[in-house]
Amino acid sequence: MSSSNLFKPIPLGRKVLQHKVVLSPMTRFRADNDGVPLSYVKSYYGQRASIRGTLLITEAVAICPRAKGFSNCPGIWHQDQIAAWKEVVDEVHSKGSVIWLQLWATGRASDADTLKESGFHLESSSDVPVAPGEPVPRPLSEDEIESYIRDYVTGAINAVQGAGFDGIEIHGANGFLVDQFLQASCNTRADQWGGSIENRSRFGLEITRRVVDAVGKDRVGVKLSPWSTFQGMGTMDDLVAQFEHFISRLREMDIAYIHLVNTRWLEEEEPGIKTHPDVDNQTFVRMWGNKTPILLAGGYDADSARRLVDETYSDQNNIMVVFGRHYISNPDLPFRLRLGIPLQKYNRDTFYIPFSDEGYLDYPFCQEFLDQQDVDQVVVAA
């Protein structure tokens, strides 16, 4: 596997990565009650940065208090949060790796009680609940939409200029606020923010445009999940046309990358479930072309990741593979993948334990990795 294109260097933004294995953004609930990352969060990311030239994307990070729909998730709107994230960034950079922060607003997918405790209401593009019987969100006003856009810009500036992140990823996937505007299954507005493909795209595109203006196009990526039905998404009739329009406009902005989530893993975990024939996003991958990197996520393992870059997209040199659960349990994942070393099994029960380092810092590096040289000197590029 060491000769795979998975282990060839690739430029992304202002850096050159040494391989194409990416740490997925994954919520872990390791922030305090004020949204400040706990002291050992820097060790978690530092462990996974130990192979030089690795791209890490942080867990979803709330852009403002009203965007933080769950307890013990981190934010990026006040100085204590920025300072804690700077420690994380410094740790990752000391290992020779690269880290981007994911900007997040939860919208109707929030825990309503958590918002209420903080003095906020459940809100979204429209008054459509995430599922039948769930709390009904309040549609955002024009002024509130503008406020959210400004908060995304401030979050990007805080991340890049304040904490020193190499870039930011706008979370437009998985049924959170940007997705709630993008898809007609949620967005029933009849103003400039809904009612047509162009109008439903406006919120996410305006966020992206203004963030690009604030921090630079080579420091901005966008994550989308076109086929996901998670949190009430993926059921609109013109889904392909909607995402073709949105992605084509992102491409025109020449952003650093696009991050696409497929739902192939659902077929494995939920036998009998029906997924779209293009669940692997080939339509959108081909549409993006070789312009800038394409990050693909969706339950990949060593074999399927290799096939993706070496066979499915052998004619494109910009495909990167995003790993989530396997990266939780294997902090040296790129090293293991290149040498064919068996992966450690993850423990789902420890994924989301607030104020605990169990299942967070205690997965060991493989002995081969430790024997090779000091962990901060390891490079896996072929």
From Swiss-Prot:
Function: Probable inactive dehydrogenase; part of the gene cluster that mediates the biosynthesis of fungal ergot alkaloid. DmaW catalyzes the first step of ergot alkaloid biosynthesis by condensing dimethylallyl diphosphate (DMAP) and tryptophan to form 4-dimethylallyl-L-tryptophan. The second step is catalyzed by the methyltransferase easF that methylates 4-dimethylallyl-L-tryptophan in the presence of S-adenosyl-L-methionine, resulting in the formation of 4-dimethylallyl-L-abrine.
Organism of origin: Claviceps fusiformis (Ergot fungus)
GO MF annotations in UniProt: FMN binding; NADPH dehydrogenase activity
Coiled coil: none
Chain positions recorded as substrate binding sites: 171, 174, 352
Positions contributing to FMN binding: 25-27, 60, 102, 171, 223, 299, 324-325
The protein's name: Probable inactive dehydrogenase easA
Gene symbol of the encoding locus: easA
UniProt xrefs under Pfam families: Oxidored_FMN (PF00724)
